[in-house]
Regions:
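Conserved glycine-rich cofactor-binding loop
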Residues: 11-13
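The beta1-alpha1 cofactor-binding region of Rossmann-like NAD(H)/NADP(H)-dependent oxidoreductases
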Residues: 53-64, 95
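Active-site loop of short-chain dehydrogenase/reductase
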Residues: 74-76, 89, 120-133, 166-169
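Substrate-binding pocket helix/loop in short-chain dehydrogenase/reductase
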Residues: 89-90, 97-101
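A short, exposed helix-loop element centered on a Lys and neighboring polar residues
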Residues: 113-114, 158
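Catalytic loop of short-chain dehydrogenase/reductase
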Residues: 127-152, 157-158, 162-165
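C-terminal helical subdomain
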Residues: 166-178, 189-234
Length: 234
């Protein structure tokens, strides 16, 4: 049976690596982002689909899943990778920018999870994955908006895992504790004479972890996995 996957908040890093690894195994993959022009090369590479969606809009998220239904049916796995980022001194933050960041990270995660859960409950199971960050468990100075959103997303995953796990829907949260070596990042410019594996997470390695959790037997499901470079302090 062909695996069907929907990756929301798709880009060039860990989400692209997950799309590639799934496609290599014969999966059908749909990619969702606000700007799908940036996904053209990846879509063609994996033979997948690209759907435009603003995850903060109820109607757009509902339409995303309707389009996915029409293209390939109910996804077996949904990865929520979208995230908002705003930082700065608390006295200087733009409230509207903070609101948008929270909507994208937390509320968008809820909307996508709700649509995924409706379908997976009807089909008898599935997996809903979420990409977190160091800020999911630790609030740093001047990073209040990012931590607020990621804390909310983590709380969502814990609640969903307890509600949906007994109904055969695997909910997992991945804490990416460090910087990702996404294409286009120049490590030599940032940290000269540094081995990238010492300071950044490789997107392909993150994707391998997603796949490993996806393939877990339900007698031994992970709810949360944290990933970091081997020399990262924590």
């Amino acid at each position: 049976m062909t695996l069907k996957a929907l990756i929301v908040g798709a880009g060039s890093g860990n989400s692209a690596s997950f799309a590639r690894i799934l496609a290599r195994q014969g999966a059908q993959v749909a990619l969702a982002a606000r700007n799908i022009e940036k996904l053209a090369d990846l879509k063609n590479e994996i033979g997948g689909y690209a759907i435009s969606c603003d995850v903060t809009e109820v109607d757009q998220v509902a339409n995303l899943f309707l389009q996915t239904d029409a293209i390939m049916g109910t996804p077996d796995v949904v990865l929520y990778n979208a995230s908002g980022f705003t930082s700065g001194p608390i006295a200087e933050l733009d409230p509207l920018a903070v609101q948008q960041s929270l909507m994208l990270t937390g509320y968008g995660g809820f909307l996508v999870a709700q649509q995924a859960a409706k379908r997976m409950l009807a089909s008898g199971g599935g997996a809903i994955f979420f990409t977190g960050a160091t800020a999911s468990i630790k609030g740093f100075p001047q990073f209040a908006p990012f931590a607020m959103g990621k804390f909310a997303l983590r709380g969502l995953t814990q609640s969903l895992a307890r509600e949906l796990g007994p109904l055969n829907i695997h909910v997992a949260h991945f804490i990416i504790d460090g910087s990702i070596a996404s294409p286009g990042r120049d490590l030599n410019a940032e940290k000269p004479s540094t081995n990238i594996d010492d300071v950044m997470l490789e997107p392909d390695a993150i994707a391998e972890t997603y796949l490993s959790v996806l393939n877990q037997h339900r007698s031994a499901w992970s709810q949360e996995v944290d990933l970091r470079p081997w020399k990262e302090s924590f």
